[in-house]
Amino acid sequence: MISVLRLGHRSQRDARISTHCGLVARALGASEIIYSGEPDPKLVESVKAVVKNWGGPFKVSYEKSWRKVIAKYKRKGFSICHLSMYGLPIQTIIKKVRKRRNVLVVIGAEKVPGEVYKLADYNIAVTNQPHSEVAALAVLLHEYFGGKE
């Protein structure tokens, strides 16, 4: 099971990009996305509408505390994979990640707190260049599922 945690959503600034994170997560094989940061019922309803119209068991929810989400998933035995341009190259780590049955993928919006890097089992870089968290999520899911998403 792949779950995605979107950190630090800002309703005015991130509505579109956070929606795209949910759409990519759903389309490329994740089971759910959890948003943290500012509450944004429109965002959650928008992704739920896509699930209703296009089908599938995908879940979307909001949790104020990202720390609680990470702690909960660690207790459930999930591996925590944080996507960051400062991580290990995806090419060198993806085989290990694929062996993990349950993975929580963490993607940022605003500046990611240093604590996330420490809590993660893997800090993974899709490239060492700045780019979109949507792109990083898409590449990770594609690589995790070996193109069979």
Model-derived regions, located:
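Long, charge-patterned amphipathic alpha-helical coiled-coil/hairpin "stalk" segments used as oligomerization
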Residues: 87-126
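Glycine-rich anion-binding loop/nest that anchors nucleotide
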Residues: 80-84, 107-108, 127-128, 148
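Short, well-ordered alpha-helical microsegments
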Residues: 43-44, 66-70, 90-91, 113-114, ...
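Structured adenosyl-cofactor binding patch, chiefly the S-adenosyl-L-methionine
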Residues: 116-149
